[in-house]
Amino acid sequence: MRVNDSPSDEVYQTRLQGAQTAMKRAGIDVLALSGPDFHNYFAGLWGLPVGRPVWFVLQQYGKPAFVAPRSEAREISARCKTPVAVEWVEWEGPIAAPMTNQDALAQYTRGIAPNPGLIGLDFNCTSGANVELVRQALGAEHIKDVTPMLQELWACKDAAGIAAIRQSCDIVREQFLACRNAIAPGIPEWKVTLASVTAAIERNGELLAEDEELPRFWPHQLNMVGSGADRTARCHPSGGGRIMQDGAIAQICLCGQTFRGHAACFDRPVPIGSKPLPANLRKVIDVAREAQSAALAALRPGVTAGEIHAAAVAVIKRSGWEAPFLHRTGRGIGYSDWDGIELKAGSQTVLEVGNVLSIEPGVYVQGIGGARFGDTVLVSETGYEVLTPFDLGRNI
């Protein structure tokens, strides 16, 4: 497909059929999903700048529909082919209409399934308040969390998903180059973030070409920058006002949904200026890089997520720091910023061909600093393929 094309109707139909098969197996009569990542996965709807609930509704048989606020109905129709079946409003008009999202969802659900057994919600993406409102409207005994079912459904990426993830990786490459060019002594961190955001918008503009609807930037594109011993020893400083100093590093974290809602991960430490790095900081960097290499060496179909994490941890523990860990070794990404897999201690999740993962072990030592090398990796028949530019920024 051309880079600015959405997946074909056949791709969405295959995904819907997969969901309907899973629903029958789990005894779910109706799905009602509020998570934007699921809207994108099943219908190609992405980038609505709205906080009001939008529900994607699917039965075991038949076609899906949206239940949405009237403010977004036209926007949804412009961005995807799935119709809006019921609109809810926030004013009284001559024609009666539901005035809350839960009443609109209940009206539509009862119309298509008068006696539903179980209605599946994505609890992980739906606020607790909205879950409770839906329980009140449809009966708590009918509501079930189907987050695990959905995460299993999209754990292995299809060809269209992998193609879009590759474009996200292309964008983070441009972001990193822009970040590296902006890093210099005397410059505030936020200017590096500005360079990254601008690069992402420009590259999205090139890839999406003439498409009128899809946003070129979305807030779920993380452009995190932290410099110096204290800020890099925390894993997620975010482009503040700190002035970068010669002889230190800036840790760049480019994780997020950069292209049509598809996520990538790319992390690199970048030296600031021309002064040599302190030996103890150099050790942090070297160990972080070696830990990622160890995790990759263990990666192949059939191993568990916990085994990948253990390979990275073994390298870091040998270095003798007392408490250098702040996070897991990685996670499943691609259709969202977290697709359900966790590369963490004890995880028995067996990795499969088609999983897309972040491999990003980090080392964080207070008083010295932190470093992380992160890449987006596809599990393949022969082991893995790194989708991000692996050699870029690796040797520092």
Swiss-Prot record:
Alphabetized Gene3D superfamilies for the sequence: Creatinase/methionine aminopeptidase superfamily (3.90.230.10), Creatinase/prolidase N-terminal domain (3.40.350.10)
Domain of life of the source: Bacteria
Transmembrane residue ranges: none
Protein's UniProt name: Agropine synthesis cyclase
InterPro entries recorded: Creatin/AminoP/Spt16_N, Creatinase/aminopeptidase-like, Creatinase_N, Pept_M24, Peptidase_M24B
One Pfam family in the UniProt entry: Peptidase_M24
Protein family per UniProt: Belongs to the peptidase M24B family.
Organism classification: Bacteria, Pseudomonadati, Pseudomonadota, Alphaproteobacteria, Hyphomicrobiales
Signal peptide: none
Keywords: Plasmid
